[in-house]
A protein has these predicted regions:
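Bacterial Sec-dependent N-terminal signal peptides
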Residues: 1-32
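N-terminal capping segment at the start of a domain
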Residues: 32-56, 72, 78, 92-97, ...
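Catalytic-core environment of secreted peptidases
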Residues: 32-48, 53, 64-72, 76, ...
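Second-shell loop/turn segments in exported
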Residues: 46-56, 81-83, 153-157, 220-222, ...
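Noncatalytic luminal/extracellular "stalk/propeptide" segments of secretory-pathway proteins
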Residues: 49-161
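Soluble metallo-hydrolase cores and metallopeptidase-like ectodomains found primarily
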Residues: 115-134, 183-264, 281, 285, ...
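His/Asp/Glu-rich mid-to-C-terminal helical/loop segments that flank catalytic regions of hydrolases
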Residues: 281, 396-429
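Metal-dependent peptidase/peptidase-like ectodomains
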Residues: 288, 297-397
Length: 429
């Protein structure tokens, strides 16, 4: 065989090998995305009742995550317990307006700090266009308005804050408050659920009748005192132990609104939780240079309780963290990735931008103002180099904190570029 034929054969073999390697890589990526999506589906299922504190939903999800970290090949998995006080709504959740039944999570939600209520109540509507504070409180003092529920619009709470607070207190004889939500989809929160106020407070959709006369309700709440939950921490040992990388995501969500309505939280934040499990699996199979820690936090939607606890009780000194990645809501289809970066993390962010520009993982990285909106915050406050990655404003984002944040409205599109950006960064940082 001549030299030219040998060279041609060698070239052809190289091409074939490259094609085969590319096909294997594509297959592995497809399997990775499939495994990732399967975990998102599991975590957002009814089994975990919205990963809240009623029905022990969050802790059940935590046990599932612990097992997934173990299956991923982590060298060590531990649970870090902590306690919180939290208001929940696990029982009756019935509300009718002028005899018409409203649907929890769609037509109405509870403020997270609201007590329950039972009975039929007259409605007193506040006219914010022709606002007269003295007249309102004089009207509410009349015998015929005793124990009425006050109805106002969403912006009343901002425009007339002092009066709004007065309506919440026993100083005013109204039985409770109802106010209309401004967006098409009702949201639910847990951030201020560590207390219970004196009167029931209900959010209703913009379709709530402006001329409604009365409401009938049977709503139960349960305040959990010193409820024990836990962070799940997995470790993959590296070649060096003087520094480490940390990957975080919160696995808790909003829980339930009565016995039948739950908040699945596929995008927020089953998506981020599943992602750090796949990252643990990746580094367990590819021994890293530095130790890797993967922390699934509970209590985030209860205002960063789990991450704050960990930051105060770290299992390795915070000074050893080389870089921390917080993944919160990465299950969307926006080609632009939102992020927030701590001051010590800016050098790393510049490298991330460079890698993103070279490889086109995302159209761009849109850096916003650093804020206390997710689990990176307690670390940023303590001088840790960190970044918060969130895929917001895509088609899934409209369902944020609603009962419609389901596996069906979740998109895995942003998962793979996020995974590649992170692993590429760690290889070069």
């Amino acid at each position: 065989m001549g030299r030219n034929n040998k060279n041609k054969n060698t070239t052809n073999m190289k091409k074939l090998l490259l094609i085969m390697l590319a096909m294997v890589a594509l297959q592995l990526n497809a399997q990775n995305v499939e495994h990732y999506s399967k975990m998102v589906k599991e975590l957002s299922s009814k089994k975990y009742m919205g990963r809240g504190y009623a029905y022990d939903g969050a802790n059940k999800a935590g046990k599932y995550i612990e097992k997934e970290f173990q299956k991923a090949g982590a060298d060590e998995v531990i649970c870090q317990p902590f306690k919180l006080n939290i208001n929940t709504f696990p029982g009756k959740m019935s509300l009718k307006v002028d005899g018409k039944k409203l649907t929890p999570g769609i037509d109405f939600t509870m403020r997270e700090f609201s007590p329950g209520a039972k009975g039929t109540f007259k409605l007193y509507h506040i006219d914010t266009a022709n606002y007269d504070s003295k007249k309102i409180f004089a009207d509410l003092a009349l015998p015929e308005n005793k124990d009425a529920f006050v109805v106002c619009d969403f912006w009343f709470t901002y425009k007339h804050g002092a009066d709004f607070k007065r309506l919440q207190s026993k100083e005013c004889p109204n039985a409770g408050l109802i106010y209309t939500w401004s967006d098409p989809l009702l949201k639910f929160y847990k951030a201020y659920g560590e207390r219970v106020i004196e009167k029931p407070m209900i959010w209703v959709s913009s379709s709530f009748p402006k001329d409604a006369k009365s409401v009938t309700m049977d709503i139960e709440h349960e305040f959990l005192q010193d409820y024990e939950c836990f962070n799940v921490i997995a470790k993959v040992e590296g070649k060096r132990h003087d520094k480490c990388y940390v990957f975080t995501a919160h696995y808790d969500h909003l829980g339930v609104l009565g016995k039948k309505t739950y908040y699945p939280g596929a995008h927020d934040n089953a998506s981020g939780t599943a992602a750090i499990i796949t990252l643990a699996e990746h580094y367990a199979a590819n021994k890293p240079e530095y130790d890797m820690y993967f922390i699934a936090f509970s209590g985030e939607d209860a205002y960063l309780r789990g991450s704050e606890w960990y930051a105060e009780h770290p299992i390795v000194p915070l000074s050893q963290i080389k870089y921390l990645f917080n993944l919160d809501m990465i299950g969307d289809n926006n080609p632009v990735q939102y992020c927030e970066v701590s001051d010590p993390g800016m050098d790393g962010f510049k490298l991330m931008e460079k890698l993103n520009n070279e490889n086109k993982y995302f159209k761009s990285l849109n850096r916003g103002e650093l804020a206390g909106n997710s689990d990176h915050w307690p670390f940023a406050q303590r001088g840790v180099a960190c970044i918060f990655l969130e895929n917001a404003e895509g088609d899934a984002f409209q369902y944020y904190h609603t009962v419609m944040d389901t596996y069906k409205t979740f998109f895995p599109d942003s998962y793979e570029p996020t995974f590649k950006l992170i692993t590429d960064f760690i290889e070069k940082y």
